[in-house]
Amino acid sequence: SVTHVGTTAEQAFAMAAGVCQDHTHVFLALLRDKGIAARYVSGYIYEATQAYMASHAWAEVLLAGNWYTFDISNQHFTPNCHVYIAFGRDYADAAPVRGVRTGGGDERLYSQVMVSTSPQYIPQLNAQFAAQQ
């Protein structure tokens, strides 16, 4: 990728390139420029065909007192497939892993996430989301 966690919305927009984090930062910058409340969300997106997945980022926008999902990268606008980890102003607020390490030696971080649905709750979630519309 041509971007990294430190890439700003302005830089990603100028490059016309990036990943979900960059798409979300650009979208948030445009919304905030217009005075629209919005937040950065980090988590995972559930794909029935994939048992393991990478982290993902999307936005939520506050409209008429309700938060609405805007996954610009995947063009998803309902939260049915999103697994929330954290939300905040930007990646720095909602980084899925953050910390400080001191001392010598090598380090490695390995994580694995498995997500599956529970069919009994999907109709309830869909009804709850529809009621908020």
Regions found by a protein language model. Give the residues of each.
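Secondary-structure boundary elements
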Residues: 1-18, 26, 91, 102-130
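Hydrophobic/aromatic-rich core segments of domains that either
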Residues: 22-105
